[in-house]
Design a protein with these regions (language model features):
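Secondary-structure boundary/capping micro-motif
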Residues: 1-166, 171-345
Length: 345
């Protein structure tokens, strides 16, 4: 089938609004997204163009967007630092203790905003990801002290659409301490930690460190109060896109045949739909989520985020000392779920 320039232009808009996902993630969302964008008049297209757009297959989407995707191929790394304190009091996570199918069991991790230089004070971002739904919230902190970690967790717990039932973390000292243990015990939250040396235990939140945090604010050094305020305003808006509109895939099975590993993923959908479709969700929570969803214009939200990140990048580059080159990597390229070897949603 031949697609005209108007169809490809509309496809590019949809792809950009959803954070440039792969075709297998974008295709299942097109019918819903096109309707939303037309409702807010972000897409002014004919019914015929809309019908052609939503009928595109994942493979066709990838082919048509190949040139656009090539423009954004930027790579980088995420930094987290291991540590140890009261490990004996915090059980190592095992699958027998952990119910991934129920919303409320989350993985937590921190992302460094040090600009490649760990010296001196700088901001961190706490990422919290629900395993069952993929719902993700982020908060940036001036440091990793218990005071700021717990304050961020309280904010995130209030923002989540369901109660937190379990917290799983790595062995970093910002998490393995009496303060977080007491916070979980007071709230009757199961508190577990990953196995030392097994990075894949926290694969869901590690993926979101990349897909949510690095693709939005990159690898610059953020160490001022103004930058911290901007970061948290960005996370408030990014939560709307990530949770209500960005499609995600979950690994269903992995079969090894000799040297070949075959992975099967489910149909891409959003954390919002995974949450509202789950039998454990109460009616009042579902109604509240749907009300919020109906008010979000994803294209306008994306523009707001872009404006805020531009302010953030201007702030951080303008304070760079003379003679120090500006980091080339502003943003990381999102890893696609269909190519990602981890168990992340």
């Amino acid at each position: 089938m031949k697609y005209g320039e108007d169809v490809i232009a509309a496809l590019t808009i949809c792809w950009t609004v959803l954070g440039m996902p792969a075709g297998k993630r974008l295709a299942p969302m097109l019918t819903e997204l096109v309707a939303v964008l037309r409702h807010f008049r972000e897409l002014v297209i004919s019914d015929e163009t809309a019908a052609l757009l939503v009928s595109m297959s994942a493979a066709t989407i990838d082919r048509r967007l190949a040139d656009e995707r090539a423009r954004y191929k930027i790579k980088g790394r995420v930094g987290t630092k291991p540590g140890s304190l009261i490990r004996s009091q915090i059980p190592v996570r095992t699958w027998a203790q952990w119910d991934d199918a129920v919303p409320g069991f989350v993985e937590i991790d921190t992302v460094f905003h040090d600009g490649g230089n760990r010296g001196g004070g700088h901001a961190f971002t706490l990422t919290v990801t629900d395993i069952a739904t993929g719902w993700t919230e982020s908060r940036s902190l001036p440091d990793r002290t218990a005071k700021h970690i717990l304050a961020a967790l309280n904010q995130i717990a209030a923002a989540m659409p369901f109660p937190i039932l379990g917290v799983d973390c790595d062995n970093g000292s910002e998490f393995i301490n009496d303060d977080l243990l007491a916070w979980c015990q007071d709230r009757r939250i199961t508190f577990t930690r990953s196995r030392p040396g097994n990075k894949n235990d926290g694969c869901h939140v590690e993926q979101k460190n990349w897909v949510v945090v690095r693709t939005v604010v990159g690898y610059y050094r953020y160490d001022t109060a103004s930058e911290l305020l901007l970061l948290n305003e960005i996370w408030r808006l990014q939560s709307q896109l990530t949770n209500y509109f960005h499609p995600q895939q979950k690994l269903v099975s992995k079969v090894r045949k000799g040297a070949k590993v075959s992975r099967k993923h489910d149909t891409a959908t959003t954390p919002f739909h995974r949450a509202t479709d789950h039998p454990s969700m109460t009616l009042d929570r579902i109604v509240a989520l749907k009300r919020t969803y109906s008010l979000i214009n994803p294209a306008a939200t994306q523009r707001q985020i872009q404006a805020l990140t531009n302010q953030l990048f201007t702030l951080t580059t303008s304070k760079a000392p003379a003679g120090v080159p500006t980091p080339l990597t502003k943003r990381a390229r999102s890893r696609e779920a269909t190519n990602n070897p981890s168990r992340a949603s």
